[in-house]
C-alpha cells in the first residue's frame, strides 16, 4: 500500500513541477505551484488550475493580429474624427453670424490720407455752396480724377492738413473765380501797354535731367514808367496780375495730369518767380503801391495756393537786405527757404545748372531778351485823352499821350513818345514811388503763391 501511494505522489510531484516552470511567465499562478507534494488531494485539486495557464500559453501568439486590427481601426477612427472636425469647422465658418467687412476699394491716396478723404467727402457741398466748379482751368470732379486730386492736395497742404480751413479757402477761391472769371482775363482781355508793357513775362525752359518744363514768371519793376499810372487803378492792376498768373498756370498743364502727386513728396506743378529791381530806387512807399500790394496778398493768398517753387529777387541793392531779415520774423521757415536775394542779376543763371544757358543774357545765360523770348498778356494802345498842350507836363498823363503820334501799333512797338517824355517827367517818379515796391510786392506775390507758408510760425 505504501508503494502504491508513493508512485502517484511522484507523478503528482512531477506534474506539479512542470507547470511550475511555465508559471514563471505567469506570476499569478506561482502560489499554486509552490504547494507541498505530500498531499495528493491538494495536487489533484490544483491540477485544473494549472491547465488554464497551459491553454493561455498556447494562445499567446494570437494578440498581434488583434493589435494590428485595433491600430487600423484607431487610424480609421482618427481619420473619421479629423474629417468630422474639418466638416464641423467648415460648418462653423459658414454659420458665422458676424458679417464680413467689405474690402476698401478707395484709391490708396485716400486710404492712406484720412484728411484728404474727408476733404473729398466735402467737395460736393463745397461746389454747391460756391456755385462754381472750375479751378485753374480744371473742372473739379471726384477722387478718381487726377487733376482734381492734385488741386485738392494743394489746398489741403496750404492749410497744413486742416480740412476745415482747406474747405473754407476752397469755397472762397471758387466764389472769387466765379466773380472774376480769370480764364477770360487770360484769354481775351487786353490791357493798356502804357501801363503794363514790359512789366511781366512768362518763359518755359526744358530741364534735360527731369525732361520736364520749368515755368518762370518775370516781374520787371524797373520798366514801370509811372507808378501812379500803373498802380493807380487798383482793379485794373489786379486783373492784369491775375491774367499773367493764369497764363503761367496754363503752362503747368494741371488739366493734363494722369497721376496723383505724393502728398508728402515733390509737387511738379509749381513755378519759379523772378523779380527784377534794376534801376528801381527804394526811398519811400507810394500809397498806390501799398494798396496794390495789400490787395495782391489778399487775392493771391486765397486763390493761388502752393504754386510757388522758388522766388528770386535780382538786382536787389545790398541795403535791402533788411527786408529779408524782417520777413523772417513774420513768415515761416518754409517760405523763407524759397526766397533767394541776388545782388547782381547776371548770377541768376548759375542757379540753374542744367538749363541756365537758355536764360536771357541779361541774367547770365545765352538766351534772347525777355521782350523777344517771353510771353505776356494781351496789350493794346490806350486812346489818348483830349488834353491841352499845357497838360502834357503832368507826369501821370504823359504815357497816355503815346498814341497821339498817329499810328498806334507803331507807337506801341517803338515806344517813341514815351521815351521822349520819360526823362522829363517819369524818371523822378520811379525812384520816389517805388521805394518799397520790392518789399511790398515781394512778399505780396510770394505770399499769394504760398498762403500756407504766409502764416507766422
Curated annotation (Swiss-Prot):
Superkingdom to which the source organism belongs: Eukaryota
Chain intervals with Basic and acidic residues compositional bias: 39-59, 380-391, 418-427
Main location: cytoplasm
GO CC terms, sorted: cortical endoplasmic reticulum; cytosol; endoplasmic reticulum membrane; plasma membrane
Keywords: Cytoplasm, Endoplasmic reticulum, Heme, Iron, Lipid transport, Membrane, Metal-binding, Microsome, Transport
Cofactor requirement: heme b
Membrane topology according to the record: Peripheral membrane protein
Region of interest: Disordered: 1-107, 378-457
Residue ranges with Low complexity bias: 428-457
One Pfam family in the UniProt entry: CRAL_TRIO_N
Domain CRAL-TRIO: 196-371
Regions that span the bilayer: none
Subcellular location: Cytoplasm; Endoplasmic reticulum membrane; Microsome membrane
Keyword hit for Membrane: yes
Catalytic reaction equation(s): a 1,2-diacyl-sn-glycero-3-phospho-(1D-myo-inositol)(in) = a 1,2-diacyl-sn-glycero-3-phospho-(1D-myo-inositol)(out)
Record-listed heme binding positions: 221, 241, 275, 277, 311
GO function terms (MF aspect): metal ion binding; phosphatidylinositol transfer activity
Any one of the GO BP annotations: regulation of exocytosis
Keyword Cytoplasm: yes
Composition bias, Polar residues: 7-16
Database matches in InterPro entries: CRAL-TRIO_dom (IPR001251), CRAL-TRIO_dom_sf (IPR036865), CRAL/TRIO_N_dom (IPR011074), CRAL/TRIO_N_dom_sf (IPR036273), Sfh5 (IPR042938)
Function, as annotated: Non-classical phosphatidylinositol (PtdIns) transfer protein (PITP), which exhibits PtdIns-binding/transfer activity in the absence of detectable PtdCho-binding/transfer activity. Regulates PtdIns(4,5)P2 homeostasis at the plasma membrane. Heme-binding protein that may play a role in organic oxidant-induced stress responses.
Family under the similarity heading: Belongs to the SFH5 family.
Record protein name field: Phosphatidylinositol transfer protein SFH5
Amino acid at each position: 500500500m505504501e508503494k502504491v501511494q508513493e508512485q502517484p505522489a511522484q507523478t503528482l510531484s512531477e506534474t506539479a513541477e512542470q507547470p511550475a516552470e511555465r508559471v514563471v511567465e505567469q506570476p499569478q499562478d506561482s502560489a499554486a505551484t509552490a504547494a507541498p507534494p505530500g498531499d495528493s488531494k491538494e495536487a489533484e485539486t490544483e491540477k485544473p488550475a494549472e491547465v488554464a495557464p497551459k491553454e493561455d500559453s498556447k494562445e499567446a501568439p494570437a494578440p498581434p493580429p488583434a493589435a494590428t486590427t485595433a491600430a487600423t481601426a484607431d487610424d480609421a477612427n482618427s481619420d473619421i474624427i479629423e474629417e468630422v472636425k474639418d466638416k464641423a469647422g467648415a460648418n462653423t465658418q459658414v454659420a458665422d453670424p458676424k458679417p464680413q467687412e467689405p474690402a476698401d476699394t478707395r484709391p490708396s491716396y485716400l486710404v492712406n490720407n484720412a484728411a484728404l478723404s474727408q476733404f473729398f467727402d466735402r467737395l460736393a457741398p463745397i461746389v454747391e455752396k460756391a456755385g462754381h466748379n472750375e479751378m485753374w482751368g480744371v473742372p473739379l470732379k471726384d477722387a478718381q480724377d487726377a487733376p482734381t486730386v492734385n488741386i485738392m492736395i494743394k489746398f489741403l497742404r496750404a492749410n497744413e492738413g486742416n480740412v476745415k480751413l482747406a474747405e473754407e479757402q476752397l469755397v472762397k477761391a471758387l466764389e472769387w473765380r466765379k466773380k472774376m472769371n480769370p480764364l477770360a482775363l487770360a484769354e481775351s482781355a487786353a490791357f493798356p501797354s502804357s501801363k503794363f508793357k514790359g512789366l511781366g513775362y512768362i518763359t518755359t525752359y526744358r530741364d534735360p535731367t527731369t525732361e520736364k518744363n520749368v515755368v518762370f514768371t518775370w516781374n520787371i519793376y524797373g520798366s514801370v514808367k509811372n507808378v501812379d499810372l500803373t498802380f493807380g487803378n487798383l482793379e485794373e492792376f489786379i486783373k492784369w496780375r491775375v491774367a499773367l498768373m493764369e497764363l503761367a498756370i496754363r503752362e503747368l498743364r494741371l488739366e493734363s495730369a494722369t497721376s496723383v502727386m505724393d502728398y508728402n513728396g515733390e509737387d511738379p506743378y509749381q513755378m519759379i518767380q523772378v523779380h527784377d529791381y534794376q534801376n528801381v530806387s527804394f526811398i519811400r512807399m507810394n500809397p498806390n503801391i501799398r494798396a496794390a500790394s495789400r490787395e495782391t496778398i489778399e487775392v493771391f493768398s486765397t486763390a493761388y495756393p502752393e504754386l510757388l517753387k522758388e522766388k528770386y529777387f535780382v538786382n536787389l541793392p545790398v541795403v535791402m537786405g533788411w527786408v529779408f531779415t524782417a520777413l523772417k520774423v513774420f513768415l515761416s521757415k518754409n517760405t523763407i527757404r524759397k526766397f533767394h536775394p541776388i545782388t547782381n542779376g547776371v548770377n541768376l543763371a548759375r542757379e540753374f545748372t542744367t538749363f541756365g544757358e537758355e536764360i536771357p543774357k541779361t541774367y547770365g545765360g545765352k538766351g534772347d531778351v525777355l521782350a523777344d523770348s517771353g510771353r505776356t498778356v494781351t496789350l493794346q494802345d490806350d486812346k489818348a485823352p483830349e488834353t491841352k498842350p499845357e497838360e502834357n507836363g503832368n507826369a501821370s498823363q504823359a504815357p497816355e499821350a503815346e498814341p497821339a503820334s498817329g499810328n498806334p501799333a507803331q507807337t506801341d512797338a517803338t515806344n517813341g513818345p514815351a521815351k521822349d517824355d520819360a526823362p522829363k517827367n517819369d524818371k523822378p517818379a520811379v525812384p520816389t514811388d517805388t521805394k518799397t515796391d520790392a518789399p511790398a510786392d515781394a512778399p505780396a506775390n510770394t505770399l499769394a503763391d504760398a498762403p500756407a507758408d504766409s502764416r507766422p510760425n
